Amino acid sequence: MNKIRKGDEVIVLAGRDKGKRGTVSQRKDDSYLLIEGINLVKKHAKPNPLKGTTGGIIQKTMPIHQSNVAVFNAATGKADRVGIKVQSDGTRVRVFKSSGTEIKGT
């Protein structure tokens, strides 16, 4: 079970975008995340008439490692660690380590 999932609101802990918040839009590989509005880079693209694309400078979201982000806890307004709790019926749920409350979401 992944502790950070698609749709989670996260806060960046390290790097150029430290302190910024965004929503996870996609998981790349196993430990890299694409976060909306975070880690934007400018790429120079050549025109390709076969694909119908024009050339120029485009902004692209690049993946960021999951160790550099933490799930944002709206109740405390801070980044929080995530734990896995096994319920009595055997299902596993994600909980915030600081408060023990269940993480709602996807």
UniProtKB/Swiss-Prot annotation:
GO terms for molecular function: rRNA binding; structural constituent of ribosome. GO terms for cellular component: ribonucleoprotein complex; ribosome. InterPro entries: KOW (IPR005824), Rib_uL2_dom2 (IPR014722), Ribosomal_uL24 (IPR003256), Ribosomal_uL24_CS (IPR005825), Ribosomal_uL24_KOW (IPR041988), Translation_prot_SH3-like_sf (IPR008991). It comes from the Bacteria. Signal peptide: none annotated. One of its GO terms (biological process) is translation. Keywords: Ribonucleoprotein, Ribosomal protein, RNA-binding, rRNA-binding. The keyword Signal does not apply. The keyword RNA-binding applies. Disulfide bonds: none annotated. Pfam families: KOW (PF00467), ribosomal_L24 (PF17136). Belongs to the universal ribosomal protein uL24 family. One of two assembly initiator proteins, it binds directly to the 5'-end of the 23S rRNA, where it nucleates assembly of the 50S subunit. One of the proteins that surrounds the polypeptide exit tunnel on the outside of the subunit. Part of the 50S ribosomal subunit. This is Large ribosomal subunit protein uL24. It comes from Verminephrobacter eiseniae (strain EF01-2).
